[in-house]
Amino acid sequence: MEERLDLPRLLVAAPASGSGKTTVTCALLRAFQRRGLDPCAFKCGPDYIDPMFHREVLGLPSRNLDLFFSGEDQARALLSSAGRGRGVAVLEGVMGCYDGVGGTERASSWHLARTTGTPILLVVRPQGAALTLAAMVQGLARFRSPGMIGGLLLNGCSRGLAELLTPMLQRETGLPVLGWLPQLPDCAIASRHLGLLTPGEVQGLAEKVDRLASQMEETVDLEGVLALARSAAPLPAADRARAKIGRAHV
């Protein structure tokens, strides 16, 4: 019988870029770190800047899981190898949940979640919509099978709006709303036309991440987030040697 690895994990995805995936990922990593969970981080796709932020938070490397340049077996092996001995893993998605290569879902956040058996925490910005949010979330949850979205997090949201939207979204979508984060302009991780600034260009990054994690401890059900992470399917327990073997597409 093949050895399996139980690695609690979740993938932070969103309907589109600019929803706050990196902010939420970094805040979760710090919050889990405070709880002594020894977290590790991964990035969907080849992007190198987001992993720099993960490393800045954790003090250890974040790894890329790219289903275009490597196959599904190697992605699972890399996740298993790097996650061995860790208490929880946070995978940061790319663009919108289903945005992959050439207008398909190939190598998308959803593709990686499906391949690795990782539940998705969907980050949603609720500005300018109410019930329509439920229609959007429901569409995302059902767009491809299997549906990998296991919970929602409202980002850039006031307490009053969160109290209004949470029961409605849960009733209409059947998905738990695991919390909310308010707009914290002084904690924003700035971006530019070619993407995020690098960590060295963000003044006071450690303090910003600390404040975001403290806010998350107040307004996000971290036990619920961990329960979602613990629902992840077991992984093949690949050793480090196997994780380095595989075909790459260049």
Where are the predicted features?
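Short, low-complexity, intrinsically disordered N-terminal peptides in bacterial proteins
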Residues: 1-10, 236-246
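Conserved small/polar residues in nucleotide/adenosyl-binding loops
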Residues: 248-250
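ATP-dependent carboxylate-amine ligase catalytic core
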Residues: 2-19, 23-116, 124-151, 159-164, ...
